[in-house]
């Protein structure tokens, strides 16, 4: 084996250990202060980051299993050794300090080692969604200036890597998690084999300034061209601290990771290790496999997006598998159907906890605890975190009265560093001392927030504002409806007509009289609950709703169906 000398892995050559950043806005800029000044003074009160948390947790649990790797279990100490080997490999391959690296992979345990190396060292990483298009992937890699791309070497990603090499000027090499396929022999290196060449070294977190750029997360693109949200050392560490302080965790977490580690799934890595838990990683979400693993591995916690929860509810095995070990199911990323949530609570018990956030203030803006899931609060996203300033503001930046609709605005160390290479967009979103989330909400007398919609999704019909989310909550209560998406369709009289696009439950009647009756019942229910302005002018039945790569209903795609050829556009 090669060695990297006697130095501990992760210790920077100087106090900064900074990665280069180009085009970072004022909110997260590169500064030479820590390199140019006396290091001890700068670091005296410098906050810890996720690398410190992870390295410390792995040491604390060095003899305890923390990760399944195939048929074997890795202890905290063994995982730290693997991470140290990956750090040495990244530095040797020119994919470590000072460069931008992309990741395209299905879920696999090695991805957590790659993520761990990035957290410990402060590397700048950008994850690509496994289901993203070639055009989206090329845009992200070009925008982020990616020079190396790590891939899971399955045929789909090998083909994608070859195409990206043709379209991304900055892309110089491919790193595979496993043997290099013949098609990539000329340009790829087996990252796992390279890491195995090195002797494990003591794992030590690099000292990073709070505004260190450690990742770019690209927005889903449902409201326009994807934007690179700058993840900083401070932002991610704040998120993790809030997860640990305010969220409910099993005493002995056995966490099933079945959502993409390229996105929200990875946010549960460090907290689970800190809690002394063990992680089981599934390559992808499959309802039968998830239910089997929960039973056989006695899983105590997992994280799902709503569409995954619906799939579990609709699978026959959810009635026969022993799921009694499951203590906590975190859910978020998109609005949940309150009727289906109530069904899930009846089926699985009061084990559900909702989180709300966005890339610009990740995951922890609000939290709806398990015990707060009573019938009247199933449409709530919870109470605001105590570790950030959260307010509902009107269009003039003033707080709204309780019960009135305002935009959720956030400030504090949770905030991301702005948008990559988009100073004007950064100034529009991070302004007047607040992050303006674009989400509209009301607050009840107990301090619980209820999101009514996105600012950009609001429908203007006949001069009145309609919030689709409120209409969707009523439509979802109809017994024939499995999923619903409400959008504004062009209308000569009203400007926009409230239109409900629904997916029927499997046992619902689909003949014309049944559809007509359902439409009338939905219109009457919305009119009674919300008013005649909110009542859908049309109810359109479809086989399925288009989803984004993150599993959210793609309202932009649904809306486009009605606006194509209209001669004007909304949103």
UniProtKB/Swiss-Prot annotation:
It comes from the Bacteria. It is an enzyme of class 6 (ligase). The gene is fadD8. GO terms for molecular function: ATP binding; long-chain fatty acid-CoA ligase activity; medium-chain fatty acid-CoA ligase activity. Signal peptide: none annotated. The lineage of its organism: Bacteria, Bacillati, Actinomycetota, Actinomycetes, Mycobacteriales. Pathway: Lipid metabolism; fatty acid metabolism. This is Medium/long-chain-fatty-acid--CoA ligase FadD8. It catalyses: a medium-chain fatty acid + ATP + CoA = a medium-chain fatty acyl-CoA + AMP + diphosphate; a long-chain fatty acid + ATP + CoA = a long-chain fatty acyl-CoA + AMP + diphosphate; hexanoate + ATP + CoA = hexanoyl-CoA + AMP + diphosphate; dodecanoate + ATP + CoA = dodecanoyl-CoA + AMP + diphosphate. Its EC number is 6.2.1.2, 6.2.1.3.
